[in-house]
């Protein structure tokens, strides 16, 4: 899917590389996807991005867009990622999802929770 992906694995014809969902009246959302893998990104020799998912949030207007990234807990590449390391220490935990058995679907899919906070001391870091 990615323009520089040279892997010979078969592509899933149902995966478009992007999705869209709306929040409910409480601001909650849910979606299903594959867990992305790490990839080399050429920033410097042997540079890899950790597993992550980009989120684009839109308000009432298309121009009111916020972008952030969600990382997965325990990823060994976080300690090398300049996007993650560029965040103040106290905000880094807000960038990492939390594994949750409550949203895990038995025999099907692991579940993670990622709360996006728009304002306040624990606001999610946006790009």
Question: In which residue ranges do the predicted regions lie?
Answer:
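Beta-strand-dominated extracellular/periplasmic modules and repeats
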Residues: 1-127
């Amino acid at each position: 899917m990615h323009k520089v992906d040279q892997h010979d694995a078969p592509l899933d014809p149902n995966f478009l590389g992007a999705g869209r969902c709306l929040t409910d009246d409480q601001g909650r959302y849910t979606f299903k996807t594959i867990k992305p893998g790490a990839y080399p990104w050429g920033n410097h020799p042997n540079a890899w991005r950790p597993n992550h998912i980009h989120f684009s949030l839109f308000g009432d207007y298309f121009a009111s867009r916020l972008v952030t990234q969600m990382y997965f807990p325990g990823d060994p590449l976080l300690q090398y990622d300049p996007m993650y390391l560029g965040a103040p220490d106290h905000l880094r935990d807000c960038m990492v999802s939390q594994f949750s058995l409550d949203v895990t679907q038995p025999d099907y899919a692991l579940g993670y929770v990622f709360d996006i906070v728009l304002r306040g001391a624990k606001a999610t870091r946006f790009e």
